[in-house]
Structure formats: structure tokens, C-alpha cells
Amino acid sequence: MATPAARSPFLEPSSTTAGVPRTPFPVPPGPSDITYVDGADRPPSGRLVLIGRDGGEGPNFGLRESLDIGRIEGVVILADDRYVSPRHARIVARRGSYHLRDLDSTNGVFLRIPFLRGNADPSISRKPLDPEQELGGQELFLLGQQVLRFEIVKNAEEGLGVASENGTLLFGTPATPRFARISQRTVEGVIRDVFHVRKAETVIGRESGDIVFSDDPFVSRRHAVIRVLPTQGGSGRRFTLADLSSSNGTFLQIREEVQLRHGDHIRIGQQLLRFDLDTTSPGA
């Protein structure tokens, strides 16, 4: 069965603490406030396209030196989405390219990671993230309706060892190592289920895999994979996340400013946006 292309809510709506006024982010300078020298650093023209629930293109917004996205403040106003913070994210032009920044939003900004195998859109020639994205712990990532947090377990959590009573070993299911855990976050702001990464490859999907979300129609049959790999020198472990050519993609929360590339998909609240550049303009 084909995976429907749609979006869904994921975290608790942004709110303002009662009685405490929210301090707005400073409004960035407009296009007339920035001067380019001989056009050397001028970025190509382009647009930010809002993708509808049916997968079709909605309103689009021309790129500028600084473009803010929010529920109340900014150039791109997503007024009907309560999962979007008042001023949520910013796209800024710098040294001939565009960069995406989270403005301390409640629910974060997520960027679609590349496919592990192939590329569905041949026009996307470059990517800001590697096909296998390194995970360092505490990352949030999205697939389908699922909001998942990845955490590396501490040494004390990896295994308790063999238990005994009065010198006799206790009978039980053989223990397996725990390298990391994946927590499922709900709209109530609490953790529902916790899954453990126990082997070299942990596949997440709707019908097959090690972690299965069978009731989520927006998750592909085999959607994403987390790999446990040796570090350089083999003395430790590292973890990667990759998308398995899913229909709706896997989105990783950005932790710092990220350079955008033509064709990138951005998740903000319930909204999906596509970053398009005019590849025929100077600087593209």
C-alpha cells in the first residue's frame, strides 16, 4: 500500500507564560539596508514554497537578505499553526548563499535528510547533510507522525550483568546490549514508548523492521535506519541516521545554523516548505 503524502501535528502548541510578555526577536534589516560589492557576494534569487497537504504547491515567498518565519511575526506568517512559535526561524543570505537558523522556537526546525540510496529529485545536486547523518545524542527526528528522540546510553545502562541468588544464576531470557534508546514523544509533552538500539542496524518502518509503527499511515514500509559503527581506531562507537528512500522523508532537528541547498525541505510546526533557487541567476 502506498504511503500517503501528508503532514501531521507533532508537539505541544507554543504558548506564552501567563503574565510574562514575550520579547520579540529584533527585526532584521531589509533588502535596502545591505550593499553588495560588485555583486560578488550576491546570492541567487529564489523562493520559499509552502507545500499543501495534497503535495501541491501553495503560496511562495521571494528570498531576500533576511526572511523570518513565524506564527505572528516575520515575512512568512503561518497564523493557523499553533505549533509554530511567534517568530520561529530565519533564512539569511551570507557570502553568496542562504542559511537557516532556529530562533529558540518551542518545537524546533527540521531539515529533510538525503536518501541513503539514490535521489528522487535529480535537480538537487548538493546537500547540506550527508546521506548518513551522524548522531551525537539528544537529537529529535521526525518520520510520519512520530517525534523521536535519540539518546546514547551511559555505560552503567548498557547491561547489568548476570544476576544470581544464593550463588545460583537466575534463569531468564538472554540479555542483549543496549547502545542507545529512542523515545517516542507525544503531544502531551511526555514519553510514551522507549525503544533500544541493540545491534549494528536498527530499521524503523510501518510493516517491517526492528521498530514498527503499524498504525501510522505516513511511515513507509521500511522508512529509516540507525547504524552503530566503530569510531576511527575502533576504540568506541558512533551512530548514524539514514533515510531508506521513504515517501515522506526523515527530518532531523537542526542544532545550529545550516546552509541551505536548492530543493531542501524544511519542517516548521505542521508546515512543510521547500527552498528553491533560480539556478539560472548569477551566483547559483
Where are these regions (language model features)?
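Intrinsically disordered, low-complexity acidic Ser/Thr-rich regulatory segments
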Residues: 1-81, 125-127, 132-215, 280-284
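Long compositionally biased, domain-poor regions of proteins
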Residues: 151, 168, 189, 222, ...
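Extended helix-rich, non-globular scaffold segments
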Residues: 272-273
